[in-house]
Amino acid sequence: MENGATQSTQRARGMTKVIVDGKEIDVPPEYTLLQACEAAGAEIPRFCFHERLSIAGNCRMCLIEVVGIPKPQASCAMGVKDLPPNKDGSPKILNTKSAMVKKAREGVMEFLLINHPLDCPICDQGGECDLQDQAMAYGVDDGRYRENKRAVEDKYIGPLVKTIMTRCIHCTRCIRFTTEVAGVPELGAIGRGEDMEITTYLEHAMTSELQSNVVDLCPVGALTSKPYAFAARPWELNKTQSVDVMDAVGSAIRIDTRGREVMRILPRVNEDVNEEWISDKTRHVVDGLRTQRLDQPYVRVAGRLQPVPWKEAFATIASKVRASSGKRIGALAGQLAGVEEMFALKSLMAKLGSKNIDARYPGSPLHTKFGRASYLFNSAIAGIDDADAIMLIGSNPRREAAVLNARIRKRYLKGNVLIGVVGEKADLSYPYNYLGAGPETLAQFVEHAPAQKEKPMFIIGQGALNRPDGAAVLAMAAKAAASLGVVKDGWNGFNILHSEAALPGALDIGFVPEEGGMDTAAMLKAGELDVLFLLGVDEVEVPAGGFVVYIGTHGDRGAHRADVILPGAAYPEKSVTYVNTEGRAQMASRAAFPPGDAREDWAILRALSEPLGQRLPHDSLGALRQALYAAHPHLSRIGQVTPGDASDISKLAKLGGHHDKAPLRSCVSDFYFTNAITRASAIMAECSALAHAAARTAAE
């Protein structure tokens, strides 16, 4: 009676009972046998199977025994629901450790190694190679093959991915990734059997901004990182968890260092943000951390920057600040600034009696006073998976947030979603309905909108906001959101897509001018300020005349204009908090040390406050964070999204103003050159040149 009740409960839940290596478990019928075995704790080797790619069933390494079926089965390609039922109705028995399975795996491994070269000592995959690990665990100690091995010519597929195709085992992970995830089907297979080759057909550089993820996916050494070739072995490296700042997505990354040098950057899994992908810019900007670095303080003397001790640099700044008043002192924060240093700079400016602080692009309508929901990606990035209609307004997510764009493509492949674009036409890697170029298109769309969807979403890029009529465009989008059900009970699809890592955090702590303070545009007018502090600001033109203090990492535009340079720490060189575009506070840990006399930005500001006569109270990073969390408690919830109040969006509708007919354009014109670190990178320069050449060729 009890057994019958249990079976009835399982059927009601839609679960299927199987026995794996003697262990009885219930699994959903849509599981593959591989997933069922892993749910039971069994380890199943694989090369071609990947959780985020379609099933290929190429490698046959995942063979298991299904009792009742005479031959071993590929567990990745067979579903639980496909199992033939036992005549007596008993659960199917799956064996992963039987003699049949052991012999089958040894045979598969022997075939895989027939043509695989003995390159392990010179292979960059050595030490983190799936083939090495599985050959040790499931192979035999001697092969019977004595004929000549095949050799395959290496292919050129760009400056980022190195190919040694003789090592390829034809798992096709790279093909499936570029086709399905990246949406740029540039890799494919030609030939069959032993003559099969992975190629770009016509030899050329790949164009996807996510192409280097194939290096992580490749289970052997066929595809490796070209810039990292022969640089280090994995066991030599210290590994530090951190956060990417090349865009505002806040992808989870791992920074590998050797000594004081950053050697490489790899992705970490974060299902809610980047899944397990990162952009090529995130991964390969490493060489930009080594070049054009500021490693000591400088003061401009007779028109030339001269290296000086810290004490002299501080004294020079103090003399200028004392000669001015709070109303004629201002501070701007750049796109890579962390929350802690912006909080310290805001505190210092308050002590100096200045309300002139800003981190926004000149003329941006975003402001703390409208509430958090007015400037965040409110549905969260994972909310894209649930949307049934997506409108991109003044945004090209492929250039502004490549990983987020892959998420939109993933939603498109799932089906039953409408995607519309207001702004520039571009290849986004998925089809969309082009509605028009200018803001007036949005008004027309509201008037002739189709039937409301269940979970519609607006994604508003900075290209729609960083323009003279940005406030009017934002107000129009807020009104459209209200009329189309973008914001309603249980769903907030009104999303601002930031392109700068610092801006959401700056808005969270109020690093914007208060009543009576000057914004970015006002501070950049000639003659308005006597002293201007630039915290890593390199994207704006600072007029001549005022005294400029630059705290930053590279000899870029801001440093060239500066009268005093204080060398700071780049993002891998400091422990700092960033808030991503969805409002998720994330901690970046220090992986390396800044070069020379450079120091962490908050420490520079703390030291500077003393000669200015306005001593900041925090003597340690812990004390600074304690003050930060007291003022903004939500920032202490690391890794969590603190949602904004959806009613705040209605405030935006009251902004008003007139919009012009100028087309909306993406705020990012060159994916590979977006900040000082990327502009210092030779690899990014090469990628940029190739991208421009490809664009010219496509236009011809």
Map each language-model feature to its residues.
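N-terminal export/assembly segments and adjacent metallocofactor-ligating motifs
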Residues: 2-30, 35-38, 50, 65-69, ...
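Protein-protein interaction/assembly regions in multi-subunit complexes
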Residues: 36, 44-45
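Serine/threonine-rich, repeat-prone extracellular segments and beta-strand-based repeat modules
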Residues: 47-55
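Short, basic and Ser/Thr-rich N-terminal targeting/leader segments
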Residues: 55-60, 249-251
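N-terminal single-stranded DNA-binding subdomain of primase/primase-helicase replication proteins
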Residues: 59-80
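Non-catalytic alpha/beta scaffold blocks inside enzyme catalytic domains
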Residues: 361-641, 696-700
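Long, low-complexity segments enriched in small/aliphatic residues
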Residues: 623-700
